[in-house]
Protein backbone atom coordinates (compact mmCIF):
# COMPACT_ATOMS: atom_id res chain seq x y z
CA UNK A 1 0.00 0.00 0.00
CA UNK A 2 2.87 2.33 -0.80
CA UNK A 3 4.08 4.55 -3.60
CA UNK A 4 7.64 5.59 -3.07
CA UNK A 5 8.47 7.41 -6.28
CA UNK A 6 9.13 11.12 -5.96
CA UNK A 7 6.93 12.05 -8.93
CA UNK A 8 3.88 10.59 -7.16
CA UNK A 9 4.81 12.52 -4.01
CA UNK A 10 4.90 15.78 -5.97
CA UNK A 11 1.31 15.20 -7.14
CA UNK A 12 -0.05 15.07 -3.58
CA UNK A 13 -1.70 18.37 -2.67
CA UNK A 14 -3.16 19.58 0.64
CA UNK A 15 -6.64 18.79 -0.73
CA UNK A 16 -5.59 15.24 -1.63
CA UNK A 17 -4.10 14.93 1.85
CA UNK A 18 -7.38 15.92 3.51
CA UNK A 19 -9.28 13.36 1.44
CA UNK A 20 -6.77 10.73 2.49
CA UNK A 21 -7.27 11.55 6.17
CA UNK A 22 -11.02 11.27 5.68
CA UNK A 23 -10.41 7.75 4.36
CA UNK A 24 -8.22 6.80 7.32
CA UNK A 25 -4.80 6.92 5.65
CA UNK A 26 -1.82 9.22 6.10
CA UNK A 27 1.56 9.72 4.39
CA UNK A 28 5.06 9.01 5.67
CA UNK A 29 8.58 9.00 4.26
CA UNK A 30 11.33 6.47 4.91
CA UNK A 31 13.74 9.21 5.99
CA UNK A 32 14.39 12.92 5.77
CA UNK A 33 16.58 12.35 2.69
CA UNK A 34 14.06 10.16 0.82
CA UNK A 35 11.99 12.34 -1.55
CA UNK A 36 9.19 9.79 -1.90
CA UNK A 37 6.11 9.24 0.26
CA UNK A 38 4.00 6.20 1.02
CA UNK A 39 0.49 5.82 2.43
CA UNK A 40 -0.10 4.12 5.76
CA UNK A 41 -3.28 2.53 7.16
CA UNK A 42 -2.38 0.51 10.28
CA UNK A 43 -4.31 -2.65 11.12
CA UNK A 44 -4.42 -1.38 14.71
CA UNK A 45 -4.85 2.37 15.13
CA UNK A 46 -3.72 4.44 18.06
CA UNK A 47 -6.20 6.84 19.64
CA UNK A 48 -6.54 8.68 22.93
CA UNK A 49 -10.18 8.60 24.09
CA UNK A 50 -10.68 12.24 25.05
CA UNK A 51 -12.89 11.38 27.99
CA UNK A 52 -10.22 9.05 29.34
CA UNK A 53 -7.20 11.33 29.03
CA UNK A 54 -4.91 10.90 32.04
CA UNK A 55 -2.59 13.47 33.61
CA UNK A 56 -0.26 12.34 36.39
CA UNK A 57 -0.13 14.34 39.60
CA UNK A 58 3.45 15.38 38.90
CA UNK A 59 2.63 16.58 35.39
CA UNK A 60 -0.48 18.38 36.65
CA UNK A 61 1.71 20.34 39.07
CA UNK A 62 4.02 21.30 36.20
CA UNK A 63 1.10 22.35 34.01
CA UNK A 64 -0.51 24.34 36.82
CA UNK A 65 2.74 26.13 37.65
CA UNK A 66 2.86 27.77 34.21
CA UNK A 67 6.62 27.29 34.14
CA UNK A 68 6.09 27.21 30.38
CA UNK A 69 4.11 29.61 28.22
CA UNK A 70 1.84 27.79 25.76
CA UNK A 71 0.69 29.32 22.48
CA UNK A 72 -1.15 28.08 19.41
CA UNK A 73 -0.23 28.61 15.74
CA UNK A 74 2.40 31.19 16.65
CA UNK A 75 5.32 29.49 14.87
CA UNK A 76 4.12 26.45 12.94
CA UNK A 77 7.27 26.15 10.85
CA UNK A 78 9.50 26.13 13.92
CA UNK A 79 7.41 23.34 15.44
CA UNK A 80 7.52 21.10 12.38
CA UNK A 81 11.27 21.75 12.10
CA UNK A 82 11.67 20.83 15.76
CA UNK A 83 9.76 17.60 15.16
CA UNK A 84 11.99 16.83 12.16
CA UNK A 85 15.26 17.38 14.04
CA UNK A 86 17.15 14.47 15.63
CA UNK A 87 16.36 13.89 19.29
CA UNK A 88 17.78 11.63 22.00
CA UNK A 89 16.92 8.06 21.02
CA UNK A 90 15.82 9.15 17.54
CA UNK A 91 18.53 9.95 15.03
CA UNK A 92 16.35 9.96 11.92
CA UNK A 93 12.92 11.31 11.04
CA UNK A 94 10.14 10.59 8.57
CA UNK A 95 9.51 14.30 8.00
CA UNK A 96 11.12 15.01 4.64
CA UNK A 97 10.96 18.20 2.59
CA UNK A 98 7.71 17.20 0.84
CA UNK A 99 6.00 16.31 4.13
CA UNK A 100 7.04 19.70 5.49
CA UNK A 101 5.65 21.51 2.44
CA UNK A 102 2.34 19.64 2.54
CA UNK A 103 1.63 20.31 6.21
CA UNK A 104 2.62 23.95 5.92
CA UNK A 105 0.08 24.08 3.08
CA UNK A 106 -2.56 22.54 5.35
CA UNK A 107 -1.69 25.08 8.03
CA UNK A 108 -2.09 27.91 5.54
CA UNK A 109 -5.68 26.82 4.79
CA UNK A 110 -6.58 26.31 8.46
CA UNK A 111 -6.48 22.51 8.67
CA UNK A 112 -3.19 22.01 10.50
CA UNK A 113 -2.33 23.52 13.86
CA UNK A 114 0.65 23.78 16.16
CA UNK A 115 0.96 24.05 19.91
CA UNK A 116 4.15 25.78 21.03
CA UNK A 117 5.70 25.56 24.49
CA UNK A 118 8.08 28.36 25.41
CA UNK A 119 10.58 28.74 28.22
CA UNK A 120 12.31 32.08 28.77
CA UNK A 121 11.44 33.11 25.22
CA UNK A 122 12.87 29.99 23.58
CA UNK A 123 10.86 27.22 21.94
CA UNK A 124 11.15 24.32 24.38
CA UNK A 125 8.78 21.89 22.68
CA UNK A 126 5.55 21.48 20.81
CA UNK A 127 3.37 19.41 18.55
CA UNK A 128 1.35 19.71 15.37
CA UNK A 129 -1.57 17.89 13.79
CA UNK A 130 -4.41 17.94 11.32
CA UNK A 131 -7.96 19.08 12.09
CA UNK A 132 -10.86 17.72 10.04
CA UNK A 133 -14.47 17.73 11.19
CA UNK A 134 -14.44 16.69 14.83
CA UNK A 135 -11.23 14.68 14.43
CA UNK A 136 -7.70 15.75 15.26
CA UNK A 137 -4.81 13.72 13.90
CA UNK A 138 -1.67 14.15 15.98
CA UNK A 139 1.36 14.06 13.71
CA UNK A 140 4.48 14.61 15.77
CA UNK A 141 5.84 16.25 18.90
CA UNK A 142 9.23 17.22 20.26
CA UNK A 143 10.86 18.59 23.37
CA UNK A 144 14.04 20.42 24.28
CA UNK A 145 13.15 20.74 27.95
CA UNK A 146 11.73 18.16 30.33
CA UNK A 147 7.94 17.82 30.10
CA UNK A 148 7.59 20.39 27.31
CA UNK A 149 5.91 18.02 24.84
CA UNK A 150 3.73 16.61 27.63
CA UNK A 151 2.55 20.10 28.51
CA UNK A 152 1.77 20.68 24.83
CA UNK A 153 -0.36 17.53 24.76
CA UNK A 154 -2.30 18.54 27.88
CA UNK A 155 -3.09 21.92 26.35
CA UNK A 156 -4.05 20.28 23.05
CA UNK A 157 -6.52 17.93 24.74
CA UNK A 158 -8.08 20.81 26.68
CA UNK A 159 -8.56 22.70 23.42
CA UNK A 160 -10.07 19.66 21.69
CA UNK A 161 -12.51 19.08 24.53
CA UNK A 162 -13.52 22.73 24.59
CA UNK A 163 -14.00 22.74 20.83
CA UNK A 164 -16.24 19.69 20.57
CA UNK A 165 -13.78 17.21 19.07
CA UNK A 166 -14.61 13.52 19.46
CA UNK A 167 -11.51 11.77 18.07
CA UNK A 168 -7.81 12.19 18.84
CA UNK A 169 -5.88 9.97 16.45
CA UNK A 170 -2.29 9.22 17.49
CA UNK A 171 -1.72 6.85 14.53
CA UNK A 172 0.40 4.48 16.63
CA UNK A 173 0.68 3.78 20.36
CA UNK A 174 3.89 4.10 22.34
CA UNK A 175 4.55 3.49 26.03
CA UNK A 176 4.75 7.26 26.41
CA UNK A 177 1.26 7.73 24.93
CA UNK A 178 -0.14 4.83 26.95
CA UNK A 179 0.61 6.81 30.10
CA UNK A 180 -1.95 9.37 28.87
CA UNK A 181 -4.59 6.74 28.14
CA UNK A 182 -3.80 5.85 24.51
CA UNK A 183 -5.23 2.57 23.23
CA UNK A 184 -5.23 0.59 20.00
CA UNK A 185 -8.44 -0.12 18.11
CA UNK A 186 -8.92 -2.40 15.08
CA UNK A 187 -9.16 -0.78 11.67
CA UNK A 188 -12.92 -1.30 11.32
CA UNK A 189 -13.60 0.18 14.74
CA UNK A 190 -11.36 3.12 13.92
CA UNK A 191 -13.18 3.73 10.65
CA UNK A 192 -16.49 3.83 12.53
CA UNK A 193 -15.08 6.39 14.99
CA UNK A 194 -13.63 8.41 12.13
CA UNK A 195 -16.85 8.41 10.12
CA UNK A 196 -18.77 9.61 13.17
CA UNK A 197 -16.26 12.39 13.84
CA UNK A 198 -16.49 13.62 10.25
CA UNK A 199 -20.25 14.15 10.45
CA UNK A 200 -19.95 17.38 12.44
CA UNK A 201 -17.67 20.36 12.89
CA UNK A 202 -15.46 21.25 15.83
CA UNK A 203 -13.66 24.50 16.60
CA UNK A 204 -9.95 24.67 17.33
CA UNK A 205 -10.54 28.29 18.31
CA UNK A 206 -13.00 27.54 21.12
CA UNK A 207 -10.23 28.61 23.49
CA UNK A 208 -8.44 31.89 22.81
CA UNK A 209 -5.85 31.92 20.04
CA UNK A 210 -4.57 35.41 20.79
CA UNK A 211 -3.36 34.79 24.33
CA UNK A 212 -1.79 31.90 26.22
CA UNK A 213 -4.23 29.62 28.05
CA UNK A 214 -3.10 29.01 31.62
CA UNK A 215 -2.41 25.57 32.97
CA UNK A 216 -5.19 25.95 35.52
CA UNK A 217 -7.67 26.71 32.73
CA UNK A 218 -6.52 23.71 30.70
CA UNK A 219 -6.70 21.28 33.61
CA UNK A 220 -10.15 22.54 34.63
CA UNK A 221 -11.49 21.63 31.18
CA UNK A 222 -9.93 18.17 31.31
CA UNK A 223 -11.17 17.37 34.81
CA UNK A 224 -14.75 18.33 33.89
CA UNK A 225 -15.00 15.38 31.47
UniProtKB/Swiss-Prot annotation:
UniProt-listed Enzyme Commission number(s): 2.3.2.6
A single cellular component GO annotation: cytoplasm
Keywords: Acyltransferase, Cytoplasm, Transferase
Top enzyme category: transferase
InterPro entries given in the database record: Acyl_CoA_acyltransferase, Leu/Phe-tRNA_Trfase, Leu/Phe-tRNA_Trfase_C
Transmembrane portions of the chain: none
Reactions listed under catalytic activity: N-terminal L-lysyl-[protein] + L-leucyl-tRNA(Leu) = N-terminal L-leucyl-L-lysyl-[protein] + tRNA(Leu) + H(+); N-terminal L-arginyl-[protein] + L-leucyl-tRNA(Leu) = N-terminal L-leucyl-L-arginyl-[protein] + tRNA(Leu) + H(+); L-phenylalanyl-tRNA(Phe) + an N-terminal L-alpha-aminoacyl-[protein] = an N-terminal L-phenylalanyl-L-alpha-aminoacyl-[protein] + tRNA(Phe)
Domain of life: Bacteria
Molecular functions per Gene Ontology: leucyl-tRNA--protein transferase activity
One Gene Ontology term from the biological process aspect of the record: protein catabolic process
Protein localization: Cytoplasm
Family, per entry: Belongs to the L/F-transferase family.
Xref: NCBIfam families: aat
PANTHER family named in the record: LEUCYL/PHENYLALANYL-TRNA--PROTEIN TRANSFERASE, LEUCYL_PHENYLALANYL-TRNA--PROTEIN TRANSFERASE
Known role: Functions in the N-end rule pathway of protein degradation where it conjugates Leu, Phe and, less efficiently, Met from aminoacyl-tRNAs to the N-termini of proteins containing an N-terminal arginine or lysine.
Name of the molecule in the record: Leucyl/phenylalanyl-tRNA--protein transferase
Organism of this sequence: Rhodopseudomonas palustris (strain TIE-1)
Name of the gene encoding the protein in the UniProt record: aat
Amino acid sequence: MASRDSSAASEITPDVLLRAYACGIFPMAESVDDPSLFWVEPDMRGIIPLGGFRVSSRLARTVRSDAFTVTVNRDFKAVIDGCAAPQPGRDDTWINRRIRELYIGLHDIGHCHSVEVWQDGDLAGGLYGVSLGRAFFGESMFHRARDASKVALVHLVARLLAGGYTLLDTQFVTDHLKSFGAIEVPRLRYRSLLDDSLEGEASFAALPLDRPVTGTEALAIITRT
